[in-house]
Structures are given as C-alpha cells and as structure tokens.
Amino acid sequence: MRRQFPSLWCGVALALAVADGAIAQPTETLRSAALADIDYQVTFDRQTARSRSIGVEMSFRTLGSEPVLLSLPAWTPGSYELDNYARNVRNFAARAGGEALRWDKVDYDTWRVRPIGAGEVTVSFDYQADNLDTGNSWATADFAYFNGTNLFLYPEGRGLAFDSRVSIRTETGWRVVTGMTPGARPNEYVAADFHEVVDMPTFIGRFDVDSAVIDGVLHRLATYPEGLVAGAARETIWEQLHGMMPAMAEVFDEAPFDTYTTLMVFPERFGGASALEHRNSHLGIYLRQLVANPVLASVVAHEIFHAWNVKRLRPAELVPYDYGRPQPTTLLWVSEGITSYYDDLSLVRGGVFEPEFFYDQTAGDITATESAGAVALEDASLSTWIKPRDGTDHIYYPKGAVAGFLLDILIRDATDNEASLDDVMRDLYWRTHKEKFTGFTKAAWWESVRRAGGGESFDDFYARYVDGREPYPWDDVLPLAGLKLVTDTTYQPLVGIYPEYDDRGAQVSDLVPDGAAAAAGVQVGDYLVRAGPIEIDDEASFDEFRAHFAEKPEGTPYAVVVQRGDAEVTLELELRISEQIERSLIEDPDASDRAIQIRESLLHGG
C-alpha cells in the first residue's frame, strides 16, 4: 500500500522491448484528449447502502475520437501515505449516446476510454465504501461519508485547473453537508479546480447538523450517529469552537474561509481519535467516550489550525499537490509539529482551558520526544511516507511541537518579548500564500525566524535540534519563560506492542523489539482480544492492563488472545516491567519578572 508509486505527472513508462537485444525506449508522456463541461454525480441511497458502496458518474464533452485517459488519485493530502484508491473501484463502464464504449487500463489507476467521436461521454463505477479511515469513504445502512480523492477522476496530463460541478443523489429526507460551494439546484455544488473538488469531504444520510456564526464566519457542526452528541455535550463542543477559532485567526490576522464545517463520526467500535484537515472543513473519527472530552477539543483545534498551516501556508515541495505520487518534504515538522504546538495553545488563548492543560499536553510531547531516542526532525519528516517501524513514524508531531515551543521562547527572549513565533507564521502566510502561492522553503522559514528574532542567528538551533539529533536544551530555554521540567521514574507492565485502533479494536501495527509480545509470537496485523483477564478494545484497556498487573513480579505468566485472520490464537507471555520517566511542566516560583512576562504573553497572545 505504501510502495513507491510512478509519477503520473511525467507519465513516463519504459517500453519493455528487450527481445532480440533491443534497448528499452521511453514512451511518450501520458496525455488525455481535451475535455470540457466536466460533471460528477455521486449516488448514495438505500440501494447502494446495501452493498456499502457509492455510485459515481463522470460526464464530459470530447472534441473527437482521441483516447481519454482518466486517473484516480493515489492519496489524500494530509495523510502522507499512498492508499491507491483505484483498488476500491468496481464495475467500471463508459458509454456515449446509449452505447457502450471500449476501454482498458494504462496503469493500475488510469483508465483509457475510446470515444467514437465528438460529444458527451459518461463513465461510471461503484466505489467500495467500507474503510473507516479519514482519507477514505465509509458507509452504513443510512449514512456515508466520502473524500473527493476517492471518487473523482481527472484527465491525465491536462493539468488540474478545470472547473466542475458535483450533483449528489440520495433519499428524500436524507441530508447532505459539505464544504463545497452550493450550485443552482439542491444538492448541487461547484468547484473552481480539481484541488478544490477533492478537498471537500461530504456527509450523506441521517446525522445531526447545526450552525453558528463564530467571529463572522458561519460554522457548521455535523455529527454521526443521530442523537449521540446532544444536549450539554454538544453545547460544550460549541463553546470550545467559539473560543479556539478567534485565537487562531489572530495569529494570521484573518480567517481565510467564508464557512467552516466540522464533520464528526463516532462509530460503535473505534479505539482512538483520527482526523484529517481540509481547506474549510475537517473530518474526524472518534471513540464515543471522547464526546466533549478535552482530548477531542485538542484534535479539533489541530485540524482547524491546519486550515492556515499546510492548507495555505505550505512547504514548497507540496505546491501544487500531485495526487499520483509521494511528495516528501523536510518541513513536515513545521506543518504538523508546529500545528500541534498551536492547537493546545489556542485552547488556552481562547479561554477554553487553563494553562495547566497546555503544560500537561506539552509534557506529554516532551516525554514522547525523549522516549523516541535520537532522530532528526528533518529525517522524520522525510520518512513518514514509508512509515518506519522503529516507533518514529509520527515523531515529527510531538518533537516538532516542542521545537516550536522552544523557538517561540527564544524569539521572545531575543526581542525582549516584542516578537514571537506568531510573527513567523503570519509573515510566511502572507508572503508565500496570500501575495503569491509559492509555498515556503527551508531557507525562507529560517530567514523569517531570524527576522522575527531581531537578526539573531538560529543556525545553531537548526544544526543541533532540527537537522541534528542532540537532546533538547530544556534546562536552558524553559526558565526564560518562567517554566521548568520535573521528572519522576515509575515502573509499568507493558505488553510490548504499538497499537492502532479501528472499528475492529486494537491492531498490532508494530512490536517492541525483544519485548514480551514479540518473544511470544504476536504478529503485526494481529488484533488483541484479551491480555490476561482484560478485554482489549481501546486505549483505556491498556490502562486497565497496567493497573491489574501493577503489583505482579516480572516474569509472571499470562495469556494473550489475538485474532489472526479468521482464527483466535492464544499465546503465553511473561510479564515485562519497563522503567518509565514521567515528566511535568510547571511554573517556576522563582522566575524573574521578565520570564513571567514572556510566559504570560506566550500563553495569552501578544
């Protein structure tokens, strides 16, 4: 699924003409016939729901009989992994004037349709919507969500600047909510280019939705299933949104959208929280116990801040998005990590939570950073596309967050609290997005940091802590903001796995080398059913496991039951006890007035 993917922008294929000693020659670049009047139609109703599928049609006009080459994206921006959505396509067909057209495939996600002349052509297929993932599509008996990257084809080699119209067919009484711009008819939408049409996740079916104006922007909150997020819980989410959004807009001096839509799915079985950002919306899938939980607020804040940082303020390597291949960048720690810094900070600045919430979240990021060992932020940013198995596949989130935190303190200290990381974000946002959408380079990032820091060089910081692998200088930097880090050592029983959660439970994504699970034969891909007497289905289950075995000696035998394919497998493990260092970020009672001023400005803006 994450294998190297050939560039569909270049479209260069090697002709395998090696018979008789012939030398392989490159073929011409893939290029579709020109298309006009592109319309998409999406169907989700009771009939398609029975097969957990979404019906898709694409109609367009051709000028002649030249072949039309249509490609489906391989990934959704923000996910940084190749999902190859073409594998979920079934029943592909093409027709014109009521007659079937010939078609074949050029590669595994590009279809070649052969029109018989000028006129309207319609291609259709069914998309299997059974993947509970924020970058994919998922359906139940009366509800579905989809991402445009899953459903909408584009003409290969013709650029992505074409406008389009989207029509959604569904049952009478079922709702549609999306960030797309409404068209002239009900359930009809328009998009200025392909980037826009695929960046608008959509709910169809039965769900709750309401709206409010926040800081001059219409905000919609859509939640599935009906009735789950109601009353005080829904009011809490709205209060949090009212607090966080103005605090974010203040960093950039504007809200870049006319409307914003928060889409939330709470399945019956889901073990955590997963969300994905878009230009004027985001889609999240959550454990039901997280309704109105502070963790939910943190995730929502993260995705909303992305509407500025990465959807608009974006590394140059990601401008424009190329939907057919990976786009690695060394700057993902800025796009994701610094967003992780601002998400919790915005909740404090917006009055949603007290500073202690930010301290606790940051202490968790520090612990994750220290536990990961020596890994450079730039290296981790590049490696995310291959998902390293050493536990560092997402380290650029917490380590990038604390890098942003330290930079903010250092900029404030260098300028006597006259400037901050806010100035860096605002400067780059306006120069590399608003004035001309070029994206920012590494050089532009550090030049902006230098300017904000009053000309102070941050070359040493970059060399040691971003490109380098040195431990972060907590004891040198935190006191500048009247803060200090305290540690405590505990000993905890661990199973020895890295879990990921979905609607089936806790799946083993990787194993701790030489850990108890690896030694007993647990395999990547297994689903944990039970560990000792503890039923495992979500993150809280592991807290129960640790509590149950807290007083047991190392080496105590216990059984683990895993689901492996269609079979349940019982394995015998020996208890392993691991030393854990707990870290807390606290205010220094002996801090200077200058340090307190920096801390207060950081926490409350300014």
Give the ranges of each region predicted by the language model.
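Short, hydrophobic/aromatic-enriched beta-strand segments in well-ordered soluble domains
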Residues: V56-T62, L72-A74, R112-F143, S164-T172, ...
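Early extracytoplasmic/domain-onset interaction patches
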Residues: P26-W75
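Intrinsic-disorder/low-complexity, polar/charged segments enriched in Ser/Thr/Lys/Arg/Asp/Glu/Gln
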Residues: D39, S53-E57, P67-L69, T110, ...
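Bacterial N-terminal signal peptides
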Residues: S7-D20
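Zn2+-dependent metallopeptidase catalytic core
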Residues: E81, Y85-A94, N150, G157, ...
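C-terminal recognition in membrane/secretory proteostasis and scaffolding
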Residues: D343-D344, V352-G606
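A surface-exposed beta-strand-loop module
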Residues: R46-Q47, S51, S59, G78-T140
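Juxtacatalytic substrate-recognition/specificity segment
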Residues: M58, D208-L332
